[in-house]
Amino acid sequence: PMVLVMSRFGIALGFGEKNIGEVCRQNGVDACTFLTVVNFLTEEISAPVTNVSNCLSIEALITYLHNAHDYFLNFRLPHLRRKLLEAIAECPQDVAFVIQRFFDEYAEEVNKHMSYEEKVVFPYVRGLLEGKKDPKYNISIFRKRHDQIEMKIIELKNILIKYYPGPGSNLLNSVLFDIFATCLLYTSPSPR
């Protein structure tokens, strides 16, 4: 995930022999925040991140999440859809239609969710940073919305496993792996 994290922070490849601190400074990225995200994503146990509150840049995290949304919605989801359509091409048409529709509904839910984060959650967090608290909103509202997306991807997995009658299960297995590796990375709850 290091390369993906770098791109989400706006760090391009080709930085030579520079260390992480130098690369972060050169790109205007908070090094503590960068390392916290990398360490969190590469840990086997996703425990709450501690002892970093003094150096973590919330604005850098918001930028990271915004760039992750852009990548996921404009590159990764369309790529997964193409791969899924290829995997189900030999299915009976009615089964392929249901699977495609379900994926498209999932993608639409993810799009709505990420749009909600961009329009509601990120401004809410920025307001908190400025000392402004919105009495009509709190982060538990966001958590409830997150759980719905996770359930949708689990339903898609169950449909594919139970009802996929087509040949070539290697391609479908690859699609399932990609969907879960990618989607759960983007839709799993943020650390509390």
Regions found by a protein language model. Give the residues of each.
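Hydrophobic/aromatic-rich structural module bridging two neighboring secondary-structure elements via a short loop
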Residues: 38-69
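Short, charged/polar, low-complexity loop and linker segments
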Residues: 51-58, 88-99, 167-177
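An amphipathic alpha-helical core segment
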Residues: 130-183
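Membrane-cytosol interface segments
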Residues: 1-45
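Charged, well-structured binding/catalytic surfaces in domain cores that contact anionic ligands
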Residues: 68-149
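Conserved small/polar residues in nucleotide/adenosyl-binding loops
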Residues: 186-191
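A general alpha-helix detector
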Residues: 19-22, 60-61, 105, 179-182
